[in-house]
From Swiss-Prot:
An example Gene Ontology biological process: symbiont-mediated suppression of host cytoplasmic pattern recognition receptor signaling pathway via inhibition of MAVS activity
Family the entry assigns: Belongs to the influenza viruses PB1-F2 family.
Keyword Membrane included in the entry's annotation: yes
Protein name: Protein PB1-F2
Organism: Influenza A virus (strain A/Guinea fowl/Hong Kong/38/2002 H5N1 genotype X0)
Misc. remarks from the entry: Is not encoded in all strains, and seems to be dispensable for replication.
Chain spans, region Disordered: 1-34
GO cellular component, one term: host cell cytosol
InterPro entries: Flu_proapoptotic_PB1-F2
Region feature Mitochondrial targeting sequence, mapped onto this chain: 65-87
Lineage: Viruses, Riboviria, Orthornavirae, Negarnaviricota, Polyploviricotina
Amino acid sequence: MEQEQDTPWTRSIEHINTQRRGNGQQTPKLEHPNSIQLMDHYPRITSRADMHKQIVCWKQWLSSKNPTQGSLKTHVLKRWKLFSKQEWTN
């Protein structure tokens, strides 16, 4: 079996640098957090913020007096178009 050569390419894939402890030993340390965890965390943050904005908007609308069927339909269509546009740009 061939041994994997230590090249700049393989080192960059591993994202490892060394850090000295107080006793002089070197330990490998990850340079960056796991990118999969980062990508998993980011949508959760943005979706919570978007959800909060939508809830606030609907509460404001519902607090208006005596909404009619027509105003409800108009409001829903405007919100849907805005939401769809944001989804495409993200």
